[in-house]
Structures are given as structure tokens and as C-alpha cells.
Amino acid sequence: GWGFYRLLDSLISDLGYPGSWPRQLYKTRHGRRGPRIVVVGGGTGLASLLRGLKEYTINLSAIVTVADDGGSSGRLREEMGILPPGDVRNCLLALADAEPLLNKLFQYRFTGEEGTLAGHNFGNLFLAAMGDVTGDFLTAIKEFSRVLAVRGQVLPSTLKEVYLEAEYTDASVVRGEHKIPQSGKRIKKVSLVPADAEPLPEALAAIAEADLIVLGPGSLYTSIIPNLLVDGITKAILRARAPKVYVCNVMTQPGESEGY
């Protein structure tokens, strides 16, 4: 809505760029690439922010969590041994200049209660297939970006297979990103397994070169913090000279931030 665009105007204006997004869009299309903005997160919150930011700049880098293990993404990582494609796909489509029908196709989810395709998202399957064709997940993302004329880049925070583990205030522990909010317990801390996952070099470079670094919006413990747990990401953000902005969710989230 209007408040969202006012937020974006404020962020960009603070960097010395015109506040009016139509004016900035005009300049971007006529040779000015815009400020270098890095957004860290995952889930639908990150994709929503990217849709707004791409109207200001094509120098966008989305650093995305790969700890998801539920739904279609979880099935694909278990059956094919790939990184979960869901959050990456959402960000790619948010930054795409694709036709509406093509966008709708890549967001299509197979329905039905039986069959191997039931519950799978077509875009997830496409990314998985592209990974097989190109030989690795990062190249698959780059080729997907080319197909959809993506503005900017989408980068997994790590290429290591990682899982998210939560410890609650009652000392109980659960492993699995999709399980964490379901317990109804208050989260004490979350950690990555393994804890020494190496960051993607391209992600570190994007952070170092950024004019603005944005954290969120999104699920605090299962979308934003997992990126910061990747070894080296937090240090890179702290070292960067760019202003850092945390975009808080409008509402608290059951299973994650009640009472905050």
C-alpha cells in the first residue's frame, strides 16, 4: 500500500536518490542503475519488499535462507538432495520482468491428494530440473534469472545443506524449520546444523559493496536469523559501511514473536 511506498521513498531518499519512485524508475531505464541495495531474509516478506525496491534500482541483491525443510521444498531437498528452492523462487519471481502468464505458471502448485506431483510448485520443479541440467544450484538460479529477465540477483546465503534447530525456554529442542513455529513454545535461541556452513562469496561481496542493507521483513527466527547464523554473514554486515535498516513485521507471529 501507500505506507509501504512511503517507507521505500524514505530509505532511498536518505541515500541521496530522488524520493519519487516514478522519477527514479525513469532514470533507471535510461541508464542509471540506482543504489546498490542488499536485502536479507526469506519467505513472502522478502519477496514483497523486492517487488517495491525493483522500481527504484536494478542493483538489488537478495540474500536468501536455505534452511527451509517443509512443503514442496522439503520434499525436493530430501528426494533429490538439492537446496530448498521455494524462497529463492519467490524472490526470483518478485524481481522478474516476466509476462503475467509466465509468472502465474512458475507459481502454479499442483493440486490433488495423491500422486507424486501433488503439492509441488512448478517453479520449484523447474529450478530442480535446471540444477540437474546445469550441474549446480547456483548456476540454475542464474539461468532462471536470465529466462525471467530478473532485475538484480538472488543469492543463497550458503550452498551448504543446513537445518535449523530451535531451543525453547523450557530447554526442549526441535530440529526442522517448518516444525519450529508449531510447538507454541517461546523460542530461546536458534542455531544452524552444521554451525560452520561457509557463506556464498558473492553474498559477502554484495554486502561489502552495498549502499544500503535491509533486514526483513519476514519471520524473525525462521527467515531472517538463519542467514545471520551462516559463518561470516553477520561479520560482513557489521564491517560494511552501508546504513543498516531492520524492517519489522506489522504484527507478531504465532510461534515466533508473540509478546514482542
Positions of the model-derived regions?
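Electropositive, gly/pro-rich neighborhoods at or near active sites that engage anionic ligands
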Residues: 1, 5-8, 14-18, 67-185
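N-terminal signal-anchor transmembrane helix
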Residues: 10-38
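Active-site glycine-rich loop that binds ribose-phosphate moieties when present
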Residues: 20-24, 189-204, 229
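Acidic, Ser/Thr-rich low-complexity segments on the non-lumenal side of membrane proteins
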Residues: 33-57
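A short helix->loop->beta-strand "cap" motif at the edges of active sites that frequently abuts
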Residues: 58, 240-244
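Short gly/pro/ser/thr-enriched loop/turn and capping motifs at secondary-structure boundaries
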Residues: 67-73, 222, 244-246, 252-255
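An anion/phosphate-binding loop that grips the pyrophosphate of nucleotide cofactors and donors
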Residues: 210
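Glycine/threonine-rich flexible loop motifs
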Residues: 220-230, 255-256
